[in-house]
């Protein structure tokens, strides 16, 4: 029996799910953002301007899908700015016309305050740096028909105690290109791993967090490849909800299948393939002569048997990271024990 861990569809669509325009603090208009991303082979962009949810149906066409969204902040205002912690959440609407959000006018979001009259909310509410409040907002945003992602914890100066208690997340950024390009080590695979081990069944994102064009490659540095049946809003949201995508800063995954207990990968040429789990079980495949890998196989039977024998079925998962010759990575989501047997 073959399980397709990544769906076999006609086409995978390239997406950036964290984008800012002149509606908030970006330098390009929504129309200019669309043009720049289409020129780089993207079909999907989530417009997630700070503090205001603005749909862009005027940008939709056969080969381009705009997703409605916004980015919300929760700041530790009492700290000096250079020490200020923050929670940032990207909220992506499951339907294109949905613009509900929580709103606190203290968060200006660049030009977003100019759109205050168009905001759909349940009234003004004060937001501060509180895990309890963040979880409440996540729960209400989920209930109003959004997917909620946790953004750039390294840029946000966050530690284990800040993120360990987060609940209800759909995804998190394992890579944020903007933060990386301005000097932060926002490769957050280790935080994703920690949150998986805490029981969060959620997905990894690589995003641009796009604000502007600049000489240091501030665009097309991180993306996801979405295995949707077609390029329309319901199909793409369905694929996002079920984790039918992978994140990348370079490598391409052509297929990821499980034949019995043997994991089979086909991909673009990479230097290394790593398999991580919740436990000491881990492995890496690479050619030490420098030859690139385009396929890999791993027999999971010993691990699966061990986890079952020790009653760890509810905790166990695998996930893959691919590293190419330039140091760029691709990340699969975690596949849990009950998906592997």
Where are these regions (language model features)?
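Metallocarboxypeptidase
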Residues: 169-215, 221
């Amino acid at each position: 029996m073959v399980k397709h861990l990544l769906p076999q569809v006609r086409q995978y669509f390239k997406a950036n799910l964290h984008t800012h325009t002149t509606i908030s603090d970006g330098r390009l208009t929504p129309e200019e953002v669309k043009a720049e991303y289409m020129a780089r082979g993207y079909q999907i962009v989530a417009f997630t301007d700070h503090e205001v949810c603005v749909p862009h149906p005027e940008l939709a066409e056969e080969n381009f899908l705009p997703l409605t969204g916004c980015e919300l902040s929760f700041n530790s205002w009492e700290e000096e700015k250079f020490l200020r912690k923050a929670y940032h959440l990207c909220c992506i609407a499951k339907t294109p016309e949905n613009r509900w959000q929580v709103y606190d006018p203290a968060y200006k979001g660049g030009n977003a305050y100019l759109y205050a009259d168009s905001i759909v909310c349940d009234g003004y509410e004060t937001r501060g740096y509180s895990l309890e409040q963040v979880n409440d907002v996540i729960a209400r945003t989920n209930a109003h028909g959004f997917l909620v992602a946790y953004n750039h914890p390294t840029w946000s100066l966050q530690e284990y105690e800040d993120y360990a208690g987060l609940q209800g997340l759909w995804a998190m950024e394992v890579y944020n290109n903007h933060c990386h390009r301005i000097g932060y080590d926002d490769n957050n695979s280790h935080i994703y791993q920690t949150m998986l081990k805490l029981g969060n069944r959620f997905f990894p994102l690589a995003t641009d967090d796009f604000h502007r064009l600049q000489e240091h490659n501030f665009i097309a540095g991180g993306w996801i490849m979405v295995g949707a049946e077609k390029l329309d809003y319901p199909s793409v949201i369905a694929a996002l909800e079920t984790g039918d995508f992978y994140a990348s800063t370079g490598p391409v995954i052509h297929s990821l299948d499980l034949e019995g207990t043997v994991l089979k990968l086909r991909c673009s040429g990479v230097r290394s393939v790593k398999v991580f789990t919740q436990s000491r079980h881990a492995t890496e495949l690479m050619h030490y002569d420098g030859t690139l890998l385009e396929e890999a196989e791993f027999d999971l039977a010993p691990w699966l048997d061990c986890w079952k024998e020790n009653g760890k079925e509810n905790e166990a998962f695998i996930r893959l990271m691919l590293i190419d010759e330039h140091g760029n990575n691709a990340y699969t989501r975690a596949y849990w024990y009950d998906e592997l047997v």
